[in-house]
Amino acid sequence: MASPLPVRTLPLILILLAVLAPGASDFNISSLSGPLSPALTESLLVALPPCHLTGGNATLMVRRANDSKVVKSSFMVPPCRGRRELVSVVDSGSGFTVTRLSAYQVTNLVPGTKYYISYLVTKGASTESSREIPMSTLPRKNMEGIGLGMARTGGMVVITVLLSVAMFLLVVGFITALALGARK
C-alpha cells in the first residue's frame, strides 16, 4: 500500500516551483578579480550578456544593498567578436599584450558601496535573466592621506643633471678638438 504523503506534498511542491521559477537564473554574469578589478570609485564594469543573446534588448538592474530602489539601464546586446569575456587577449607579442575589454560600465555610483547587479534580456519572444551578483565600488581615498614623497621626481632630476653635465663636457671636448685640429 502506497503512502498518501507524496500525493499531499505534490501540490505544495508545484506551488513552490511556480513561486521560485521567475527568480531562476538562465545565465551567469562573470566578474573579474586579481590584478584588474572591475570596481572603480564611482562606477562598475559588468560583463556583457552571453553571445546567444546578441541583438536582444538588455535591461541592467542595479540595486544598492539594503535598499529597494532599482535603477534600470537598457541597451541592445552588441554582436560577439570571438569569445565573450570581460577581458580577452587580442594579441600577445614580445614584451606587450593587447587586450580588449568587453563590459558595460555602470556610472554615477557612490564610492565604497555594495550593489547587487542583474540582467534581464528579451530577444524575440524569449526572456532570460541572470543571477543577481554583489559588486562593490572602491572607497575614495582622502587626498591628505596620499604621500607626497619624492617618488620618481628625484630620480628624474638626478638623471637630467647628469645628462646635462655630460652634454656640456661633450660640447667642450668637441670645441677643443676643433680648435687643436685647426692650429696644426
UniProtKB/Swiss-Prot annotation:
Residues 26-84 form a propeptide. Residues 1-25 form the signal peptide. Residues 181-184 are cytoplasmic. The keyword Glycosyltransferase does not apply. InterPro entries: Uroplakin-2. The chain crosses the membrane at residues 156-180. It is found in: Cell membrane. GO terms for biological process: epithelial cell differentiation. CDD domains: UP_II. GO terms for cellular component: apical plasma membrane. Glycans are attached at residues 28, 57, 66. It is a single-pass type I membrane protein. Keywords: Cell membrane, Cleavage on pair of basic residues, Glycoprotein, Membrane, Signal, Transmembrane, Transmembrane helix. Expressed only in the urothelium. Localizes to urothelial superficial cells. Residues 85-155 are lumenal. Its main location: membrane. PANTHER family: UROPLAKIN II, UROPLAKIN-2. Component of the asymmetric unit membrane (AUM); a highly specialized biomembrane elaborated by terminally differentiated urothelial cells. May play an important role in regulating the assembly of the AUM. This is Uroplakin-2. The lineage of its organism: Eukaryota, Metazoa, Chordata, Craniata, Vertebrata.
